[in-house]
Amino acid sequence: MAAGEPRDGGGYYFRFLPHRTFSSLSAREITSRLRQWSMLGRIQAQAFSFDQTFQPYQKDDFVMAFFKDPNVIPNLQLLSDSSGQWTTLGSEVKKIEAINVPCTQLSMSFFQRLYDENIVRESGHIVKCLDSFCDPFLISDELRKVLLMEDSEKYEVFSPVEREEFLFCLFKHLCLGGSLCQYEDVLKPYLETAKLIYKDLVSVRKHPRTKEIQITSSVFKVKAYDSVGVCYPSPKEHEQTFSYFVVDPIKRHVNVLYHCYGVGHMA
């Protein structure tokens, strides 16, 4: 059987957790930032519980069972490609793709190199540059050059492995925003928002013997296909359209972070 194709019996059962709220996306200061970044009304998180033990190697069976579950189908939210309104999955999922996303970072010191390499000044202001395009993004500062331009002088400040980290992915998504994104002049709002969302989604525990903090969540970037093609997170693929499944095997919860690129709420 090919990876990502349905298994007889499914194995997992899910329950929607509507009362699990994510303050990192709803606090007034954060919604103000998301509005500026053209992401408000197009990004959300939802939580579901599941009934069995989970191991990362089971990710394909887990994700397929998720999309087949009768408690998921009427509750999992996505943006309609035609109306731009929130809706639920209207087609049967035939195949899934779940890519492992490393999640090991426990500190925002991960981004200190942006200061060390003079991408951001000591004052926190992002260093400007001459405008250029990395389709569809306007690059007007050194931060976006580091995020997008592989041939830029300082692109190697973050290694390929570090760029795969969930914390880096969150940070990059916030920096790039939606289609009418108004960029920040300073770094702090991006770092603060990425940190809050990361802490809201990812579970940690203290090791009983060493007392060290450990991340217990597994993270997957997910796509689902119906008989026509990609149906989730959106039929229109874009670097800024994504869905991450953050699985806590101890609590048996999965947090789903979703965003669909477009024009966010302005009011």
Curated annotation (Swiss-Prot):
Disulfide bonds: none annotated. This is Cilia- and flagella-associated protein 300. Pfam families: CFAP300. Cilium- and flagellum-specific protein that plays a role in axonemal structure organization and motility. May play a role in outer and inner dynein arm assembly. Interacts with DNAAF2. One of its GO terms (cellular component) is cytoskeleton. Belongs to the CFAP300 family. PANTHER family: CILIA- AND FLAGELLA-ASSOCIATED PROTEIN 300. Expressed in the left-right organiser (LRO) node at 8.25 dpc. The gene is Cfap300. Keywords: Cell projection, Cytoplasm, Cytoskeleton. InterPro entries: CFAP300. The keyword Lipid metabolism does not apply. It is found in: Cytoplasm; Cytoplasm, Cytoskeleton, Cilium axoneme.
